[in-house]
Amino acid sequence: ITPQRLLATHLELVVSSSELHLYTAKENNEYFLIIDCLTRIDLSIFEEKCFSVLLALGLISGNLALNEFFILSFSEEKMSAPLDLMYQTKPSSIYTHQAVFTTNISSISHGMGLSQEEKDRLGVGLTEFPKGVFSELATQLHQHEKLRRATKLLLLGKNASMEMRLPAYYVAIEAITGHVEAKDNLLKPIRDESVAEKLIKSMKELIEVEKKLHSNDDFNSSVLLRKINNLNRPTNKDKLSQPFSFVNYSLSKEEYRILKDRNLYLHGSFTKGKDDNRYRDALHTSTRLSFLVTVLLLKLAGFEGKIINYAKLWSGAIGKNLNEDLILSI
């Protein structure tokens, strides 16, 4: 996959049990992404799977190709003459030009002052994006609405104003958290639900006994009962960090703090003013959040490798002196 130009070499992939081929074609100096299904498939399902493939490619390349679709149907596997043609207008493509993955260090290191030795070191282990992981990523996006939503929020956020970008990234992480929470009891303080129910029941019984000994003003049992009913639910701050444990990614102290700062940005409290330092701090935070959303989406698909560290790439413009590599292993 070559995300820098929104192109792909011919790629065979499997999305939710359907074998698809992804490749490019050029006509009148325009490039088209082509997706073929080699077996009979329902039109609506084909459209869903095609969008999932485009969304997966958009995550990796930073550019989501939409605008317009041409759908051709065929009666035979050779696809020599189409039976029907359908044209669809789509929302505008999203071009962020912020790929998360590269095989060419030189393509992102211009102006960074890296020596050839440093480039060679960073390039160790860089290979093409694994085909199996791409298939799994597209499959996950096809099967799970929360992951599709998170990916779209990530891409839309990259082009949004800072007031919209930061909340979009936090909501993306919340969507992924909801997906992980539905899969696993990892996010609950008490893993065994029967143990939690037993504890909650005993606490409620104790409250019923105690409230008979106190006035309503001195002992507000209704408030206590509401809190006890939520006993086995982590706080929003804690919830956002748990999916990273699920994918075996260790958060740095700064990343953990940024997740804790959710409420500072989620409700649009950040507005651009005259304080350039405040804006630069927010921009730096956005690069960290974008990285974290990417980590979750890729690692849920089984990716192990290196991705671009935009906090470092943009550190000069932001005014941060970061002792970090331009690409990081996840």
Each model region followed by its residue ranges:
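Short, well-structured alpha-helical interface segments that form or flank functional binding sites
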Residues: E48, R149, S161-V171, S250-K260, ...
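Polyanionic, low-complexity intrinsically disordered segments
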Residues: K211-I330
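Charged, low-complexity, helix/coiled-coil-prone segments
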Residues: I1, T102-K119, K198-K204, V223-D238
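Active-site-adjacent bridging/hinge elements
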Residues: T139-T151, L259-S269
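Amphipathic alpha-helical interface elements
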Residues: Q143-R233, I308-A317
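Generic structural signal for bulky hydrophobic/aromatic residues embedded
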Residues: A56, A175-I176, Y265-G268
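Short charge-dense sequence patches
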Residues: I1-L6, S115-L126, L206-H214, N232-S245
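Charged, non-catalytic interaction/linker regions at domain boundaries
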Residues: I1-R149, L156-S161, Y279-D325
